[in-house]
A protein has these predicted regions:
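N-terminal beta-strand motif that seeds the catalytic metal site of vicinal oxygen chelate
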Residues: 1-19, 67
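Short aromatic/hydrophobic contact patches that present stacked aromatics
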Residues: 7-9, 43, 66-68, 105-107
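Conserved beta-strand-loop-alpha-helix junction that forms the acyl-donor binding cleft
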Residues: 11-15, 36-37, 100
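Conserved active-site tyrosine of GNAT-family acetyltransferases
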Residues: 18-23, 81, 112
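Conserved acetyl-CoA-binding loop of GNAT-fold acetyltransferases
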Residues: 24-30, 85-87
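Conserved short beta-strand elements that form part of the metal-binding/catalytic scaffold
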Residues: 30-65, 110, 114-120
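Mid-chain, well-packed structural core segment of small domains
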Residues: 66-85
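Vicinal oxygen chelate
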Residues: 82-120
């Protein structure tokens, strides 16, 4: 058995909140756009990663995921995010911190999900 990718679906009450985090803050690009449709949806892509965003208030209230994005240069990511979108820094992990398991991490959050940025 062989897999190539794991592609998460993320549900938002308002899809523009997800676009602010993933496109404006983290630099993902919109690869497929149905944002202005009756059931807003888009596919975001960056560096071989893919995420599906959906606007669905019912499912958004049922799902609050947390993801980890692994990088080889956490300082670069932190500098960009902390300057451009400090409102996304998670209050419990707002600075790069060496964790007991050996990873360096900081975290982001919007109203729907948490994202831990991690470097091993």
């Amino acid at each position: 058995m062989n897999f190539e990718k794991l592609v998460p679906n993320i549900f938002y009450v308002d899809i523009t909140n997800g676009l602010k985090l993933f496109v404006d803050c983290l630099g993902f690009a919109i690869g497929h756009d149905e944002i202005r449709s009756h059931q807003p949806f888009c596919v975001l892509e960056k560096d071989g990663l893919r995420i599906n965003l959906f606007e669905n208030a019912k499912l958004a209230k049922e799902h609050n995921p947390e993801f980890r994005l692994v990088t080889k240069n956490i300082e670069e990511v932190y500098d960009k995010v902390s300057r451009s979108h400090p409102e996304f820094l998670h209050p419990n992990l707002p600075k790069i911190t060496l964790r007991p398991w050996g990873a360096r991490e900081f975290a982001l959050m919007d109203g729907q999900l948490g994202v831990v940025i991690q470097e091993w």
